[in-house]
């Protein structure tokens, strides 16, 4: 089931975040925050978050969350007060690859963030990819990241 794939991705992504010195707070992203919306896509992310919480009980995980509730403490106080992940998430599970790709390209181009990846997880060996729009520094950094994952 899709929720099992996302559950596994949460654990692998959190482990990768730890390799880079990030204390992961995982948000399963959606167009809904903790039941504010309805639909199959919401259910998929909510179920995946519940399975991930059960599988990784020591990992801060929440979902489903809208991106603003995941990263903004002010929005989180309104939409899900007292939630330990909401407003502080730093590790994101997107509902599909196209949404993840759009999100990272927006952060890179409008937010002027450095973007690396995609970083492919769950394989027998570290294998990564590069965007055709990357520069030489990003190629170098991906080589370092791939070596760190080996």
List each language-model region with its residue ranges.
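Short, small-residue-biased leader/transition segments that mark boundaries at the very start
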Residues: 1-6
């Amino acid at each position: 089931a899709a929720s099992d794939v996302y559950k596994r991705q949460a654990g692998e992504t959190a482990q990768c975040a730890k390799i880079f010195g990030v204390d992961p707070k995982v948000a399963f992203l959606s167009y809904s925050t903790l039941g504010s919306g309805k639909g199959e896509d919401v259910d998929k992310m909510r179920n995946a978050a519940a399975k991930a919480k059960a599988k990784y009980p020591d990992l801060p995980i929440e979902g489903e969350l809208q991106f603003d509730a995941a990263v903004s403490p002010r929005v989180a106080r309104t939409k899900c007060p007292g939630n330990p992940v909401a407003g502080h998430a730093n590790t994101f599970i997107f509902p599909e690859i196209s949404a993840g790709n759009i999100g990272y390209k927006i952060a890179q181009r409008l937010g002027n963030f450095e973007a690396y990846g995609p970083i492919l997880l769950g394989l027998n060996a570290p294998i990564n990819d590069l965007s055709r729009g990357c520069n030489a520094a990003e190629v170098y950094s991906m080589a370092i990241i791939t070596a760190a994952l080996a």
